[in-house]
């Protein structure tokens, strides 16, 4: 038979574990998913928010600050369907406090995408087939990103991040890079050949 003191210790330990789980729950990272369009002209987004009554659509600026952006096809979805919202200044929307999934569509300027959050998020970016990331001169994945290449798309994921960025390219840009590199190499060979020819002539 266990002593009452030991039983009380087990109960206290169990209570502490439950309390820790409850306190840690709000701190768990939420999910945000972005899908780049086939023509890379824009993207669709789905972002979870918890205990929220507003959301601002932003992207990182040159100094890492949050810069408001214009988006369209906004939907705020709750447990029982779509929820009405009001548009405010600086690309912000407001709605009744609660947990929601916010979806929208944004535009891309060039072959790059970046996003910024005020709290940690699990971020997933889906890049369609025909675009690549692996060449360090043309492609880029921000710190913490994990790249998984599938049959018709590339999936990039981050866990618990406030910032995510990718820069991608297509085969045409890769061909241009190789062509430029070849021209530059030929140009350097011609210069070096001329230089050594002049030195040889001066010695004679």
Predicted features along the sequence, with ranges:
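Lumenal/extracellular ectodomains and adaptor appendage modules
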Residues: 25-204
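Hydrophobic secretory-pathway targeting helix
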Residues: 1-34
């Amino acid at each position: 038979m266990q002593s009452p003191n030991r039983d009380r210790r087990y109960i206290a330990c169990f209570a502490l574990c439950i309390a820790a789980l409850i306190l840690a729950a709000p701190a768990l990272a939420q999910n945000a998913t972005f899908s780049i369009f086939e023509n890379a002209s824009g993207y669709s987004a789905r972002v979870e928010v918890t205990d929220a009554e507003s959301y601002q659509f932003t992207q990182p600026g040159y100094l890492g600050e949050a810069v408001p952006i214009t988006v369209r096809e906004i939907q705020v979805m709750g447990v029982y369907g779509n929820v009405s919202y009001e548009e405010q200044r600086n690309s912000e929307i407001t709605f009744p406090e609660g947990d929601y999934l916010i979806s929208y569509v944004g535009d891309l300027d060039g072959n790059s995408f970046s996003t910024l959050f005020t709290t940690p998020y699990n971020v997933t970016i889906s890049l369609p087939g025909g675009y690549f990331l692996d060449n360090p001169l043309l492609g880029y994945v921000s710190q913490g990103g994990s790249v998984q290449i599938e049959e018709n798309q590339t999936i990039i994921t981050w866990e618990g991040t406030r910032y995510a960025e990718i820069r991608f390219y297509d085969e045409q840009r890769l061909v241009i890079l190789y062509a430029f590199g070849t021209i530059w190499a030929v140009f350097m060979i011609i210069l070096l050949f001329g230089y050594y020819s002049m030195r040889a002539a001066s010695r004679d």
